[in-house]
Amino acid sequence: MRVAWLSSRQSQRRFLLSAILSAFTVWFLLPSSPKHEEQPAELARQYPMLWRHVHTFNGTGGAWYIPPSWLSSTDVQPETIVDAALLASQAAKSNKNRFIDHSNIPLLLHQTWKNRRVEKWSDLLRASVEKWLHYVVADDMAYFFWEDDGIERMLAEFEPDFAHRFGFLPSNVERADVFRILVLKWFGGIYADVDTRPLRQPTSWVSSSDLAPWSDSVTQMRFSFDNPVSSILGIEADCAPHKSDYWRMGYSYPVQLTQWALASSAGHAVLLRFMDNLQRRMDGVARRNRGNINTPEAIKELRQIGPLCLTGPVAVTVAVKTWLEERTGLRWNALTGSGDGGRSKLVEDVLILPITGFRTRQIRQYGLEAGHRPLSSSLAPGARIVAHLRPESRVRESLSDLVWVVQKLVEAARLTRSQATIEEGGRVFHYA
């Protein structure tokens, strides 16, 4: 009877786990914002800036907008998006008002998507890009919407030695990750995914309070910097380092950065470090595959590394973490906002925003300590951007939630198992 009872409990747990996994799978596949085509006149009325500056724009490699005040009468109108980005980055240098406040970061916004046919887009994407363009025009910013042809032109002109490897990255996810680093490396500015929406003007992303000196509560090391900010990054995971929450949620570090939004001056060292790390990793894969990165075995090895670690948030975190540690002696986990209400921290010329800075619609509150402010409102203090996440992005974002749930179920199973160890007549019975 006892063994049968234990077997029944085990079956119940297995059924519960199976049901939860099935529910997660179904939820992942549900679309968050259905696509539907609308008439051109209606699109032009609802999204006037998107219609004018993206959909109907006639350019090679993408669409762009450069404020008329940035151009002189002698400037030749660019024919490609690469020429336009180069022109705008040079024009920004001639006027201190063409930078984010307190920074060396030019007011250039870069976005990319597979096409400019906005009638095929979801309402979410249309509204998000329209909001960005509203700020672009109001703040006298330059804007660049990169298509595949434009990205290929940029690689051919600025990264000829890497261009062939770019094509051998396992998927479009990795290629998009690398693009955002390279476009900032060469032109500077802000990169933001098309499913994000700004909550405040990019010109005001850096305030005087963000520049205040701060100290590591463990080492007492003090950090201050008098020169302008040259890089802005946001935290996506802020977990207690002495607990296992972060890896249960699928993160590699207790404090981990995001890369769906970032800003930088051109040629910043953390961007160079990211590319050096990627090149070194791809060199190693090629070396183990007879010097070729394009063999099926090499591609398989790159896939096994995974986008998160190869080019995604983990790769960005490693690049920033190692550079700041070497440069300043920073203790990485000192960047947590759990003990100070989530304040920004400036290290060298890199500004690290708290988890509320670049945020998703629903931040995982179980990854936060009680010291953080409530995050239920989209107007969380200090928020610059909110990410709404497309269905394909929701899968990637929610994998960590799935890992966390599974880990909790495993813990519960272990606890039940220990409680169900029964001693009878000098014998100990365990369920398998």
Where are each of the predicted segments found?
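Glycosyltransferase-associated regions of secretory-pathway enzymes
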Residues: 2-176, 192-432
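Small-residue hinge/turn detector
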Residues: 177-189
